[in-house]
Amino acid sequence: MTNTAERVWSLDIGFPDWLSIPRGARDIDWWRPAVTLAFETLSEADHQLRGPLSESGTVIGVDEAIDTLLDFAESLPADQRLVAALGLPDRWPLPVVVAVTAVEDEPQDLLAAAGARGGRPIELPLVDYLPDELGDGIRVTRFDLDDEGAVWATVCCARRADDVDTILTWRTNKLDLVPRFSPVLESLLGAVRIGSAA
């Protein structure tokens, strides 16, 4: 559970679909052994379904995957959290940054907050409205070049409700994942629970 101004928010998620990486996870004695066991179980399930190699031709390294998530989580500002999707065989973990912020008196344009404005994308960002059940929000998909000329996709789901912006951000250079994972990202937005602080 996280405080944002006078709001309290949490994520209604859990294994095997999602993993939440808590701040200071390296200092939690039980966390890494538990996640290692969970990842080894998922890896074995992938092996049984698809053989020893992933679609990309490599074996998912459990220790490396955990270290990458921990490093990513530690790099985030205090008002952001990291979760990882585990539901796509051979492609997990897919890290997603969750940010919940109070709307200011002169709020930023939601399109800008979701990454639809600014920068130099290689084409105009795609903007879609979220399903009605998720509230007033958008999904923005944009493609940019990195310094080496590789194409990266950024998918952002943003919702503004009750004076709070909820923004989920996922980046990947595996472009074939974008149409498969975008609906999953939307479902995560529906799992963000926001209430008032006592």
Task: Briefly describe each language-model feature range.
Residues 1-151, 159-165, 169-198:
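N-terminal targeting sequences that direct proteins away from the cytosol to non-cytosolic compartments
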